[in-house]
Amino acid sequence: MKTRNLIATSSLALTMMLGIVATPLSAQQTYTPGVTVEKNTNPEWEADYTATFIYKDKDARDATNVSVSGGFQFYKPEEVQSFANTGDGANIPCYNAYQYQGGMFAGGYNLNGDAANYSMTEIEDEIFEVTIPLPANEYFYAFNIEYSDGSSETNVKDPANPALANDGSDAGWSLFYVGNGETKGQEYINPRTDGKTGTYSFVNYLAEDGTTQPLGIYLPNGYDANKTYKTIYVSHGGGGNEVEWMTIGAVPNIMDNLIADSLTKEAIVVTMDNTYFNWDYDRIINNLFNNILPYIETHYNVSKEVNDRAFCGLSMGSMTTTTLYQTHPDQFGYFGCFSGANVPVDVSKVAHLDQPNLYITAGCIDMALMNDSYNTASDRTTTGFVDKLNTLNLTNYKLEILNGAHDWYVWRESFTNFVKDHLWTKDVKIETPSETPVIKPETPASSTNTTTAPKTGDDLNLAVAGLFIIISVTTGVVIKKHY
């Protein structure tokens, strides 16, 4: 709340007259906007760390209330077991950060639709603060602001910790790390500090409709243009972009850690923007084979062997992955399908479905595990996809149900497991086709616009126990740590 400043023409005399000792400006409390992570010293909180958020409002309006929200919801594994059978989360308890207990897992949202919102205290004029306990992980957050004139702003990214962006596209939230990888499934997400790190950048290529589109490129530590590398192609979900996997998805950190610890082989990782194609799978696949792969194979020294390249994705990116698997199973040695599936063709008539390895995941309270499309012609669920594989007696897959929801906690763990435990394991060499297929979609929509991403994350409409929920989950970067 803004206050009027009164000017004292004789402040020293007034101070002496009232018997008050003036405090030098250098000794006054200062507040640094952003997030500060520290070890937890409050015995009433069970989490190992605390995160203190400080927001300084610079808007001309008078801020009266500020809160912070993000991936600060938690669940008990023993209380969510019914979801796998029913897809109903209406009666599953969700806990806030102050209620956190060891053994709980983080979720990006409340299954009942009301995300935890943490009110902040105004500690100085237009400066707001709150401290919450948190276990180790990577978290996303944003501020919600109410003004005295009745107006408000929601999901405001932290101006002191902006999300990394590429030409206007970003992960939609601010991001920070807590701890040192102590949380199961998130052991490899933190940045390395020993210099054994690769690089990532964003480049432009010519897409199938003639427009310039972006790619994210991760190169491993010590990248050598004269050395041949394996490749991992990775797709975001609905409303996302090429930036997300490189930031909230922590792909560079995961790859750095797994490579440095000799838990995987060196590989180049390529992210893309499939939102631009409005999830027209024919166009996406056409663009992949005729534009993205040729660009990568021209500009980087990568193997063209089928068993040296993989494709994976989350949610609608997983639907892209399963579509690609069912239409071109002989073009990649490995597919990672995280939280979603699509069955666009009669798979019983597709050859070579037993050729690649599949790693399939979903969260234990994931909308894509089982929802109202299960066992229907429009089934998009993980459960439905696995059932279809079983009807064909296919055994070249592994299914894992992970602790989490339809969110980045599950997807980071999925990518980690995919790279660490499932890639580059095939001993039998698959003969590489003489040339990659040229797929021509039916009358592709013309466009001369470059990519724009007004939304980020994975925006899906779903019905859960009769409640209509819109979920948008994503993130952004770290600030300070004191241990």
Which role does the model predict for each range below?
Residues 209-222:
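A short loop-to-beta-strand scaffold at the N-terminal edge of the catalytic core in hydrolase folds
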Residues 428-456:
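C-terminal low-complexity, Ser/Thr- and acidic/Pro-rich disordered "stalk" regions positioned immediately N-terminal
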Residues 46, 50-137, 146-179:
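Aromatic-rich carbohydrate-binding modules that target alpha-glucans
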Residues 223-279:
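Short substrate-entry loop that stabilizes the transition state in hydrolases
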Residues 460-481:
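A cross-kingdom C-terminal cell-surface attachment/processing module
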Residues 361, 367, 379-433:
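C-terminal catalytic histidine-bearing segment of alpha/beta-hydrolase fold enzymes
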Residues 298, 304-354:
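Primarily recognizes the serine-hydrolase "nucleophile elbow" in alpha/beta-hydrolase
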Residues 278-301:
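Alpha/beta-hydrolase active-site loop
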